[in-house]
Swiss-Prot record:
Organism: Vespa xanthoptera (Japanese yellow hornet)
Keywords for the protein's UniProt record, in alphabetical order: Amidation, Antibiotic, Antimicrobial, Fungicide, G-protein coupled receptor impairing toxin, Immunity, Innate immunity, Mast cell degranulation, Membrane, Secreted, Target cell membrane, Target membrane, Toxin
Endoplasmic reticulum in keyword set: no
Protein name: Mastoparan-X
UniProt superkingdom: Eukaryota
Species lineage: Eukaryota, Metazoa, Ecdysozoa, Arthropoda, Hexapoda
GO BP terms, alphabetized: defense response to bacterium; defense response to fungus; innate immune response; killing of cells of another organism
Disulfide bonds: none
Length: 14
């Protein structure tokens, strides 16, 4: 899991 991947997922969810 990468921080960039998490940020992108969070932005997509938000």
């Amino acid at each position: 899991i990468n921080w960039k991947g998490i940020a992108a997922m969070a932005k997509k969810l938000l």
